[in-house]
């Protein structure tokens, strides 16, 4: 079966939120190991609610923001948010995820190629995506590189207990 892309609809919310939580739980476990529980809870205590709030505002009324879902065998298995900056002509691949049980099937590639094509149609002359430099984000970095992202500005987030 082929992965199909379509616009996000309100009835996709619960499934997309579950994909988001399932896909990002390993990242947050690593964050907690790295930061320690005390700082992790200060920074990320409500990470699931933050995703729920963000996704609950989709589809966005802002024409610069589009959200699409990936369907495989009739099931929503991924999603991608794109943001077009008409001023800079730079498009962004924003929040996105593939359900863990559907990863490594080419769905991410399909989503990113779709997103890049859509951004180009909307006037983008360049595109960017942000991801973590930690080991939990290594698959995401590989996926972005596989669709042609080839320049990166490293960034670090430092924390300390006060």
Stretches found by the model and what they are:
Residues 109, 121, 125, 133-154:
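Conserved active-site alpha-helix within GNAT-family acetyltransferase domains
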Residues 103, 128-140, 159-162:
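Conserved beta-strand-loop-alpha-helix junction that forms the acyl-donor binding cleft
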Residues 3, 7-14, 18-94, 99, ...:
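Acetyl-CoA-dependent GNAT
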Residues 116-119, 162:
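Generic leucine side-chain signal with a strong bias for well-ordered alpha-helical environments
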Residues 90, 126-128:
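Structural preference for beta-strand elements that scaffold enzyme active sites
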Residues 98, 104-117, 142, 146:
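Conserved acetyl-CoA-binding loop-helix of GNAT-fold acetyltransferases
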Residues 34-38, 145, 162:
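Residue-level signal for alpha-helical context at structural boundaries
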